[in-house]
């Protein structure tokens, strides 16, 4: 089980990313637009830098929903490989079966 503080930190980052998503996208659009002047572009870059660091979606970590494990998380299920295997062995995931060839 992951530390509760680490899980809480990721939840906080997700909330911040949602809150600043539109503003961040507007600024990135201005920066990448070829028709904007250099002054406008530079002002947008400075505004983007003043936003909270944790508001960037890149800083979020995929974590297992049950254990909070940060590594080996399967996106399709939102669970770590260990919990997916346990659930599959109990038959709790429809359509998923152990491979044999």
From Swiss-Prot:
Physiological role: Binds 16S rRNA, required for the assembly of 30S particles and may also be responsible for determining the conformation of the 16S rRNA at the A site.
Native source organism of the sequence: Histophilus somni (strain 2336) (Haemophilus somnus)
Keyword terms of this UniProt record: Ribonucleoprotein, Ribosomal protein, RNA-binding, rRNA-binding
Name assigned to this protein: Small ribosomal subunit protein uS14
PROSITE patterns: RIBOSOMAL_S14 (PS00527)
GO process annotations (BP): translation
Matches recorded under Gene3D superfamilies: 1.10.287.1480
Subunit structure as annotated in this protein's UniProt entry: Part of the 30S ribosomal subunit. Contacts proteins S3 and S10.
Region forming the signal peptide: none
């Amino acid at each position: 089980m992951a530390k509760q503080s680490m899980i809480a930190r990721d939840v906080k980052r997700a909330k911040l990313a949602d809150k600043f998503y539109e503003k961040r996208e507007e600024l990135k659009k201005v920066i990448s637009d070829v028709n904007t002047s250099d002054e406008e572009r530079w002002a947008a870059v400075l505004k983007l830098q003043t936003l909270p660091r944790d508001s960037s979606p890149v800083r979020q970590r995929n974590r297992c929903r049950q254990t909070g494990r940060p590594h080996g998380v399967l996106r399709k299920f939102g669970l770590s490989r260990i919990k997916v295997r346990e659930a599959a062995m109990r038959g709790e995931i429809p359509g998923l079966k152990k491979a044999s060839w």
